[in-house]
Amino acid sequence: MKKRTQVSTIMTKDVITLNHKDNLETAELLFKKNNIRHIPVVNGEQIIGMLSYTDLLRISFADAVDEDEQDIDTIVYNMFTIEQVMAKNLISVEASSTIKDVAEILSKREFHALPVLNDGKLVGIVTTTDLINYLID
């Protein structure tokens, strides 16, 4: 049965991360360049938060301005740090967790992405899109 499959089979393994000291402009560039919507925030090797593209949109005009109008975003981004904007109360799953476990968490919580850990180390990220794509295959 599909729901007993481990999350490690559907997670993104090459995780793009942000350092907690990076700035929000760097975050926006990573979101757009890599066409992603969630980036784990780390301090050294420890994950301390998750920044979503939606978090950026809440404080800026990132989707509403042209590249020529970046000054607006720069001013807003300089008012906040990643740590002020990111989600801090994360729920993570182990790489050995089942897809059913992940589906239950995502369906009951307000998260759209979960960090995947192996012995406390970040080894992947799983999103609602990963889950849906797996289920429709």
Question: What are the functions of these language-model segments?
Answer:
Residues 18-35, 42, 83-87, 92-110, ...:
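The conserved cystathionine-beta-synthase
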Residues 1-14, 53-91, 98, 103-107, ...:
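Tandem CBS (Bateman) regulatory domains
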Residues 31, 39-55, 106, 114-129:
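A glycine-centered beta-loop-beta connector
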Residues 25, 45, 74-75, 120:
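Residue-level signal for alpha-helical context at structural boundaries
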